[in-house]
């Protein structure tokens, strides 16, 4: 059982640095300049400052603009906004100007003061779309994080991608491996223990209630959900031997996909029609990534790089994985590849880079970076060739999903 858990659990330290974002730019592309103007008249100075900083960071992370403080307004974009607060309700008006004329205007209302980061993210996402620039539809999506709270106890929290907003959703006992259950992010799956037996639950965020899906001896973890949310890939070990299973939520039918005497875990759908699955296996004597058709039990090796590839995430025909570097002690880097090509792209350069997860549009990858005694949540903008880091102040991370 210890060997099974070891391939899943990686515990990270906490970062206490003060920088809200570190921008690593690997491209010399000249971007249009944009000026941020805050016309708000808020008495809450902390909210005013934090909201402004999030807007600026969002515009940077979008990789569509160069944010400048002092420039000629007539020759650059202007992001002009007014934020108002009335009790627990926020209202926001945003105008995008260029060349002295309005290019777009949006008005938003939010009930729930603590969720103000999502209001900022939504406004930047909509403004980018209105200008016809490279979309950032993932920006207001939520991240699920399982973190240790005390000995043999862990919480599942929901956060925005900057980690400014954090809310505990599931608490009490050992709660592990959260996985979003639909693209609307209204439900997720997670593993907990029911009378010492690993059990998979579904949590409905609309009702704030959890319901039991299935249980198994050894372990049970939901690692992926298909496009329409009707099927799960589940790692189960009813006889202390982990394999990948397909679970149909409509028919309640459970199908074993792998049957290997070693370890097969972390199944992910891949391909435009979800007809294949990639997973991590030790059938070569070390963790590596394999693929097989859903209607076949014949697996083929996918990754021929590295000798410890123990984490994978997929988007259509692409996959990202974390790989231990052979000649660099403790260094794990993230790589991107397609199942239709031999080309592999290295996305990180140093430290321990773990838990890669694709955004909903495949254009960004979130991961956890551990370097020395510090850790951060990283966002890779793949096409822009940029990486942004946000300090982790959430405790020891067990797993994440985006």
Swiss-Prot record:
Residues 1-17 form the signal peptide. NCBIfam families: PRK04043.1. InterPro entries: 6-blade_b-propeller_TolB-like, Tol-Pal_TolB. It comes from Campylobacter jejuni subsp. jejuni serotype O:2 (strain ATCC 700819 / NCTC 11168). Belongs to the TolB family. The Tol-Pal system is composed of five core proteins: the inner membrane proteins TolA, TolQ and TolR, the periplasmic protein TolB and the outer membrane protein Pal. They form a network linking the inner and outer membranes and the peptidoglycan layer. Part of the Tol-Pal system, which plays a role in outer membrane invagination during cell division and is important for maintaining outer membrane integrity. This is Tol-Pal system protein TolB. The keyword Isomerase does not apply. GO terms for cellular component: periplasmic space. It is found in: Periplasm. It comes from the Bacteria.
């Amino acid at each position: 059982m210890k060997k099974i858990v070891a391939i899943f659990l990686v515990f990270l330290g906490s970062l206490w640095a003060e920088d809200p974002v570190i921008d690593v730019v690997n491209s010399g592309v000249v971007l249009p300049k944009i000026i941020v103007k805050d016309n708000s008249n808020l008495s809450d100075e902390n909210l005013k400052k934090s909201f402004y900083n999030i807007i600026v960071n969002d515009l940077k992370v979008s990789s569509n603009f160069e944010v400048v403080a002092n420039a000629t307004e007539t020759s650059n974009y202007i992001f002009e906004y007014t934020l108002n607060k009335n009790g627990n309700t926020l209202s926001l008006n945003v105008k995008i100007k260029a060349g002295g004329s309005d290019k777009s205007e949006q008005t938003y209302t939010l009930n729930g003061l603590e969720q103000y980061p999502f209001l900022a993210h939504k406004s930047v996402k909509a403004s980018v779309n209105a200008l016809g620039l490279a979309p950032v539809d993932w920006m207001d999506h939520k991240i699920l994080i399982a973190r240790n709270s005390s000995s043999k106890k862990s919480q599942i929290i929901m956060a925005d991608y900057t980690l400014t907003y954090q809310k505990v959703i599931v608490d009490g006992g050992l709660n592990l491996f959260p996985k979003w259950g639909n693209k609307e992010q209204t439900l997720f799956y997670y593993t907990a223990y029911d009378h010492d037996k690993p059990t998979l639950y579904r949590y409905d965020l609309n009702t704030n209630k959890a319901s039991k899906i299935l249980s198994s001896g050894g372990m049970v973890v939901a690692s992926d959900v298909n496009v329409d949310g009707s099927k799960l890939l589940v790692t189960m070990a009813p006889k202390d031997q982990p394999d990948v299973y397909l679970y149909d939520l409509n028919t309640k039918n459970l199908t074993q996909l792998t049957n290997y005497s070693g370890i097969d875990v972390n199944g992910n759908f891949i391909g435009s029609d979800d007809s294949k699955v990639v997973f991590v296996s030790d059938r070569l004597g070390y963790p590596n990534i394999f693929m097989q058709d859903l209607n076949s039990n014949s697996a083929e090796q996918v990754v021929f790089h590295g000798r410890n590839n123990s984490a994978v995430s997929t988007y259509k025909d692409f996959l990202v994985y974390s790989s231990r570097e052979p000649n660099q002690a403790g260094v794990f880097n993230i790589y991107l590849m397609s199942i239709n090509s031999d080309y592999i792209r290295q996305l990180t350069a140093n430290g321990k880079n773990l838990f890669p997860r694709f955004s909903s549009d495949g254009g960004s990858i979130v991961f956890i970076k551990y370097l020395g005694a510090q850790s951060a949540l990283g966002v890779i903008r793949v096409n822009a060739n940029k990486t942004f880091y946000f300090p982790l102040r959430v405790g020891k991370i067990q797993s994440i999903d985006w």
